[in-house]
């Protein structure tokens, strides 16, 4: 999954990335490696147990720090993702964090909700990689993202739970191109 995330999202040196519903930081670690010393990764997780693991993993001497991510700015935040997206919007407006380039969104089986997706959209990231473990939730959230002006440009599915209906999906969203306004015909 990490390789798929990196291939599809294409995080670059110096970018600012978000890892939402980050758990202990599987994707955070790979993002930190990719954005390097000049990049930023903001990791948000609601579970106190996995948040504690993430804080330990990404401490300056943490086990998930590599040579390439030793100096990466990694913010590990515990709490409700939707609420913290409001805080990030404020931090952006005050220049406390750079513009957001890429987002990994890996919610629970229920998926994200409209409020979370609207608040994420307000941050104006360039790319969103949605990792979903329920196709129905991904379908619902894709509809919301489409309403907000995002296009799904790539989709991969993984049968990680053989002989069950569970499918892990990874979808890349980018801003839909602006639609030209239709020209009005002049009548004489």
Locations of regions flagged by a protein language model:
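Rossmann-like S-adenosyl-L-methionine
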Residues: 1-188
């Amino acid at each position: 999954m990490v390789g798929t995330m990196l291939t599809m999202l294409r995080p670059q040196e110096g970018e600012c990335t978000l890892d939402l519903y980050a758990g202990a930081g599987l994707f955070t670690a790979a993002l930190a490696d990719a954005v390097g010393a000049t990049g930023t990764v903001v990791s948000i997780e609601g579970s106190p147990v996995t948040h504690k693991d993430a804080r330990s993993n990404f401490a300056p001497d943490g086990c998930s720090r590599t040579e390439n991510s030793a100096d990466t700015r990694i913010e590990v935040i515990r709490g409700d993702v939707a609420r913290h997206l409001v805080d990030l919007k404020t931090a952006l407006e005050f220049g406390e964090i750079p513009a957001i380039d890429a987002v990994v969104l890996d919610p629970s089986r229920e998926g994200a909700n409209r409020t979370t997706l609207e608040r994420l959209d307000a941050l104006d990231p360039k790319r969103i990689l949605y990792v979903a473990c329920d196709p129905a939730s991904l379908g619902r959230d894709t509809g919301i993202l489409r309403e907000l002006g995002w296009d799904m440009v790539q989709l991969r599915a993984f049968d990680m739970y053989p002989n069950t209906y569970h499918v892990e999906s990874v979808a890349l969203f980018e801003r839909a191109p602006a639609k030209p306004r239709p020209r009005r015909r002049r009548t004489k």
